[in-house]
Amino acid sequence: MSDIWQQLSAHRAATEATPLTDYFAQDADRFARYSASAGEMLLDYSKTALDDTARDLLVQLAESVDLKSRIAAMMSGAKINSTENRAVLHTALRAPKDAVIEVDGENVVPGIQKVLAQMGAFATALREGSYQTKTGTAFTDVVNIGIGGSDLGPVMATLALAPYHDGPACHFVSNVDGAHIHDVLAGLNPETTLVVIASKTFTTIETMTNAETAIQWLKGALGEDVSTHLAAVSTALDKTAAMGIPDARVFGFADWVGGRYSMWGPIGLPIMIAVGPESFGEFLAGAAAMDQHFRDAPLMENLPALLGLIGVWHNNICGYGSRAVLPYDQRLSRLPAYLQQLDMESNGKSVALDGSPLPRASGPVVWGEPGTNGQHAFYQLLHQGTQVIPTEFLIAATGHEPELAHQHNLLKANCLAQSEALMLGRSWDEAREIAIARGFDGVDADRMAGHLSFPGNRPSVTLAYPKLTPFVFGQIVALYEHRVFTEGVIWGINSFDQWGVELGKELATRLLPMVEGADASQKDASTRGLLAKLST
């Protein structure tokens, strides 16, 4: 494999000076040859510096780590999360009902389907008003309390699927900062609000702190017994029972589902409440279709594999340590934040599976904002900054508002213009002509030409799809899940643990008494100084 890395680096050195526009000039079919589809979803990667040699080498790299076998191992229930000795089966949560997927000799699919049916029955009763409040009325609002994977996915999904909302309004609380829960609850009526507490162990400090606050809020209006207004997503039935939540309203999931991969099951309860079991099922079906594509499509035509290999090319071969995800879809405005956890918590690792230091960079910094907002914020740096940041555009052919089709056309024009501008740039000579046309001449025109020129040659990919439906949204999220997996396999890391979050939590537990006045003399000078400054 080291030989392939060397060949990739040598090829990059030999072709780095080639403008992207030359690839199109030399190949009239470049778009067709450097794009791939999964159903009606298209990935255009023609505006990257890949040529046939680089792409072939990247595919060889994937083959050298046996990516296809690793995909099969993950989807069949092998315990590929080696540091925790766990299977990794978020794909099973959206598998067909008749699938057979075994963990320790037991088919997990019937259990998944049973919980999904329980979720559907509860969501339907809540939506139809047959499951009622303590005072005998219909619930109007749902507050989901969770953090990390228990929050980011459902928050993103309920916004993405807003056109399909026909259930109670869903609200989300994650931050332990009291301002968050205060502001969410301030606009709600406790008499018609259901609180869903999402914590697998029921020990997550932020979630349990917010849960206690919410319960006290409910009790202030309803009296001591507020169990009717509570549901939970957890496996800790003893703890949920102690909080007064009956087992019938506790939805559990196994330890082979990681938090950041969990919204396809019980963590997705608020999504199902918002859009209904049928639309939630379409969301699962879209993800399942992408799972099948990832498992079966040849690497050269495989969207998640290609996106992962492009990420490796940009990160490890080109030295671009950041990537911007730019959805030209306002309802995907939470996608970049979701991908930050999915990508950076999965692949932000510095050791290989055997515990040895990695020989090369792993996960990049992932960030972004929806277009066209970002154009009026950070695109300046994308176009003219000293760092090259690969960009990933997402755009639908049509929106959900036919009466506003002219605005969607403007959105599409902006998206395509940005990817074109990043590639083309503007030469110094062209910039000087513009300066002259604006009234500058001589030295002033030369000076302005530097400001008005764009280097171009900045890579981007575009993901295009017909419309942001539940099915398509499921495809998009699963695509990015599998892209992360592809990159993790290439780098030889475990993408399914997160030991890096532990130390800060441990120190926070020890620091809390000091924040409240206990002796801090053994702490470092900076921490002592900050404790003194923040003391109340």
Swiss-Prot record:
Gene3D superfamilies: 1.10.1390.10, Glucose-6-phosphate isomerase like protein, domain 1. InterPro entries: G6P_Isomerase, G6P_Isomerase_C, Phosphoglucose_isomerase_CS, SIS_dom_sf, SIS_PGI_1, SIS_PGI_2. Pfam families: PGI. It is found in: Cytoplasm. CDD domains: SIS_PGI_1 (cd05015), SIS_PGI_2 (cd05016). GO terms for cellular component: cytosol. Keywords: Cytoplasm, Gluconeogenesis, Glycolysis, Isomerase. It catalyses: alpha-D-glucose 6-phosphate = beta-D-fructose 6-phosphate. It is an enzyme of class 5 (isomerase). Belongs to the GPI family. This is Glucose-6-phosphate isomerase. The gene is pgi.
